[in-house]
């Protein structure tokens, strides 16, 4: 990779950062990220990064969303003031992505605010994965590479999930993702229409499509409280599905999600490691992990060398 690139990380996901740097045959850069006694974030870059191409590995999701975001911003400011040539924020899971529009009176558009903060901090480029709303790329005036976990998910399905399958979109917004996967697997497609009373609470579900005597695969970008996911699973079983799997990019797993999963009819929840979840996975044997470190490291390598990354979206063999 040469000596003009540096991989740094905050505290959000040091394990993933280490895997990425190992995959690139690079030593993880020396940066101390902690807190002062009053709770403010403390950052110290402990080696020269002058004129280097610097990549900050820092998801801005749970459990400490705001701390992770502030670490990213303060690290970027420190790196910029240390005369780095270019700063790329690698944000595998982009926090506040669900706040992408005014869905009620006097509501903020926090996704846009976060984009503004990232640019103001001096970041030149963003690499992320499966944005909850792809239009968030338009919130930025800098390049944003939105990678997809779909190739790795398709590989997992082909290798580990036998039987006649039907790909299920858990809502209308996910139909494009589900259709893409069903086409590549030559599988049927079903859609769940859900009515919400409020966030994270579904009042009713309607299934469009046939799942009888098939293995149902729910595909989505995020599993948060898992209430909707578990309800969808039980409905699919009641409609005749032989098994139900869920394949999700970001395993947020907040609240009592683990308890819900353990008590559900779900066979497996397959998530990537965009968010650290080892402790939660230890409490739920249904959780399986797809490692996306190589996808991110390859995107970094190609970005550093000025190469196209589009082929990363299509390698499903």
UniProtKB/Swiss-Prot annotation:
PROSITE patterns recorded: PRPP_SYNTHASE
Biological process, per Gene Ontology: 5-phosphoribose 1-diphosphate biosynthetic process; purine nucleotide biosynthetic process; response to bacterium; ribonucleoside monophosphate biosynthetic process
UniProt keyword Membrane present: no
Pfam families cross-referenced by the UniProt entry: Pribosyl_synth, Pribosyltran_N
Cofactors named for this entry: Mg(2+)
Residue positions binding Mg(2+): 130, 132, 145
Metabolic or biological pathway, per its Swiss-Prot or TrEMBL entry: Metabolic intermediate biosynthesis; 5-phospho-alpha-D-ribose 1-diphosphate biosynthesis; 5-phospho-alpha-D-ribose 1-diphosphate from D-ribose 5-phosphate (route I): step 1/1
The enzyme's E.C. designation: 2.7.6.1
Region (Binding of phosphoribosylpyrophosphate): 212-227
SMART domains to which the protein is assigned, alphabetical: Pribosyltran_N
SUPFAM superfamilies: PRTase-like
Superkingdom as given in the UniProt entry: Eukaryota
GO molecular function: ATP binding; kinase activity; magnesium ion binding; ribose phosphate diphosphokinase activity
Family to which this protein belongs: Belongs to the ribose-phosphate pyrophosphokinase family.
NCBIfam families in alphabetical order: PRK01259.1, ribP_PPkin
Entry protein name: Ribose-phosphate pyrophosphokinase A
Species the sequence originates in: Dictyostelium discoideum
């Amino acid at each position: 990779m040469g000596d003009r690139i540096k991989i740094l990380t905050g505290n959000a996901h040091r394990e993933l950062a280490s895997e990425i740097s190992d995959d690139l045959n690079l030593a993880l850069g020396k940066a101390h990220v902690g807190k002062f006694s009053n709770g403010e974030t403390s950052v110290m870059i402990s080696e020269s990064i002058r004129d280097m191409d610097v990549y900050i590995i820092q998801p801005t999701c749970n459990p400490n969303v705001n701390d992770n975001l502030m670490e990213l911003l303060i690290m970027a400011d420190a790196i910029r003031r240390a005369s780095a040539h270019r700063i790329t924020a690698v944000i595998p899971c982009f926090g506040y992505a669900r706040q992408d529009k005014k869905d009620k009176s006097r509501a903020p558009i926090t996704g846009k605010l976060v984009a503004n903060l990232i640019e103001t901090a001096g970041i030149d480029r963003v690499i992320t994965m499966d944005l909850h709303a792809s239009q968030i790329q338009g919130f930025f005036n800098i390049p944003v590479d939105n990678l997809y976990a779909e190739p790795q998910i398709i590989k997992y399905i082909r290798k580990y999930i036998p039987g006649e399958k039907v790909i299920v979109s858990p809502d209308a917004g996910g139909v494009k993702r589900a259709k893409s996967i069903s086409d590549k697997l030559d599988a049927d497609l079903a859609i769940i229409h859900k009515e919400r009373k409020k966030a994270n609470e579904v009042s009713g579900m309607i299934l469009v499509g046939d799942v009888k005597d098939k293995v149902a695969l729910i595909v989505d970008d995020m599993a948060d409280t898992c209430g909707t996911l578990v309800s969808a699973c039980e409905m699919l079983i009641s409609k005749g599905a032989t098994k139900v799997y869920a394949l999700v990019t970001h395993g947020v797993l907040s609240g009592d999600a683990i308890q819900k999963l353990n008590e559900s009819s779900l066979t497996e929840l397959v998530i990537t490691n965009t968010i650290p979840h080892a402790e939660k996975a230890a409490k739920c044997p249904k959780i399986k992990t797809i490692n996306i470190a190589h996808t991110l490291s390859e995107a970094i390598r190609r970005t550093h060398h000025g190469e196209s990354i589009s082929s990363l979206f299509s390698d499903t063999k």
